[in-house]
Amino acid sequence: MDRVVGGKYKLGRKLGSGSFGELFLGVNVQTGEEVAVKLEPARARHPQLHYESKLYMLLQGGTGIPHLKWYGVEGEYNCMVIDLLGPSMEDLFNYCSRRFNLKTVLMLADQMINRVEYMHVRGFLHRDIKPDNFLMGLGRKANQVYIIDYGLAKKYRDLQTHRHIPYRENKNLTGTARYASVNTHLGIEQSRRDDLESLGYVLMYFLRGSLPWQGLRAGTKKQKYDKISEKKRLTPVEVLCKSFPPEFTSYFLYVRSLRFEDKPDYPYLKRLFRDLFIREGYQFDYVFDWTILKYPQFSSGSSSSSKPRSSLRPAMNPPVPIAERPDKPSAGAGQDSRDRFSGALEAYARRNGSGSGVVQADRSRPRTSENVLASSKDTTPQNYERVERPISSTRHASSSRKAVVSSVRATSSADFTENRSSRVVPSNGRSSTAQRTQLVPDPTTRPSSSSFTRAAPSRTARDITLQSFELLTIGNGKRK
């Protein structure tokens, strides 16, 4: 499509499509900057791009929130231009043969909880938490998680009066059935607790490779959602989280114990996973599963895996977003993903480093993307009335919050800017002041087991790991 929108954004190749429109790669003809352009027919039956653009505007400034560059109407289309981002969690999950190890999941969980918390603090529920809606950044932001796709987001309280939306029943299912909370299946109005329960399912999906209610067959979409709901309700969290650390069970017991209007204890949830991360002896080095696949030399110097992989595939570059995801895992999913993205992988590599294993700093404005149209087979259902009754919202006993006591200070809910400057290597090879003082390892170089102790010999590995987590939330809330 040879078209310019917003006076300066030329549309390139199509990145994806979905029920709400199409996503294109775009280029700012004045600066050469690559962007993501989302188009929606202006005469769409249920237009939502204008609403979504307003959400982007209201959320601007938060860490992991794409920058809205322009919104308007061009001919027969509503158009929204935002930052171009890297691959989604679903893409990376496929790239890693549909399984993440514990270390990768814990590093992602901390950032993902922060993203959900930020939206809640700004007065909105996301209501479609799933792997497709969390993307990695590009260039200097390659280790930063972004949250996208606010088309189903809903305001749950007034920021002036702080009045919460009322409790309601008989609501239609909004979101993706695979990750929807039990109460959402039962037709109960969603609140903050539901976003967090959905996030818990995403984390278990990463660890397990699939969820117990995937692949259920039914004659109609409604029957399928009912089967998913039943299986989800009949699967105890202890069974869902079996063979994994008890912190994941504690997470579910806590979020399911929340009442409709309760404010979640986000620091407690993050502390659960931070303490587990430290107890496992992991290094906070930003070496994810896909980092090892891309640069195998990282594997020998990093504690990235809780269990060694039987074999490492050839180093390849992570995929960029795609439009459709498989509903069921397959044995060759990882290789299929690599083959499918062969051309696009090279583009990602050019932004995030060469095959030498050293990621070069991107001195231009960080490019970011939105895979707003990615979806699984469990798509947002059509309207239908729910007949199930709500489950009890009685809070669980306090035993559900038996977390390992930690010295981590409770992170302020207003601290949302992650300091990434300490993890960038300038092209001249010199470390910045932030790099010399913040004790965060550079993810673009091979991790060293003694790198922390040289910088601060009097501090324990636990203290330094905790500081690495805290740096994720230290800041003034301004976009960097």
UniProtKB/Swiss-Prot annotation:
Active site: D128 (proton acceptor)
Enzyme Commission numbers on file: 2.7.11.1
Compositional bias segments (type: Low complexity): 299-311, 395-414, 443-459
PTM per Swiss-Prot/TrEMBL: Autophosphorylated.
Enzymatic class: transferase
SMART domains: S_TKc
Region (Disordered): 298-461
Protein keywords: ATP-binding, Cell junction, Cytoplasm, Kinase, Nucleotide-binding, Serine/threonine-protein kinase, Transferase
Signal sequence range: none
Cellular component GO terms, alphabetical: cytoplasm; plasmodesma
Coiled-coil ranges from the UniProt annotation: none
Pfam family, one: Pkinase
UniProt cross-references to SUPFAM superfamilies, sorted A to Z: Protein kinase-like (PK-like)
Primary location: cytoplasm
Record-listed ATP binding positions: L15, G16, S17, G18, S19, F20, G21, E22, L23, K38
Composition bias type Polar residues, residue spans: 369-383, 422-438
Domain Protein kinase as annotated: residue spans: 9-278
InterPro entries with a match to the protein in the record: CK1_Ser-Thr_kinase (IPR050235), Kinase-like_dom_sf (IPR011009), Prot_kinase_dom (IPR000719), Protein_kinase_ATP_BS (IPR017441), Ser/Thr_kinase_AS (IPR008271)
MF terms in GO: ATP binding; protein serine kinase activity; protein serine/threonine kinase activity
Reactions it catalyzes: L-seryl-[protein] + ATP = O-phospho-L-seryl-[protein] + ADP + H(+); L-threonyl-[protein] + ATP = O-phospho-L-threonyl-[protein] + ADP + H(+)
Superkingdom to which the source organism belongs: Eukaryota
Localization in the cell: Cytoplasm; Cell junction, Plasmodesma
Assembly and binders: Monomer.
Functional description taken from the UniProt entry: Casein kinases are operationally defined by their preferential utilization of acidic proteins such as caseins as substrates. It can phosphorylate a large number of proteins.
Annotated family: Belongs to the protein kinase superfamily. CK1 Ser/Thr protein kinase family. Casein kinase I subfamily.
Protein name: Casein kinase 1-like protein 8
Gene (name only): CKL8
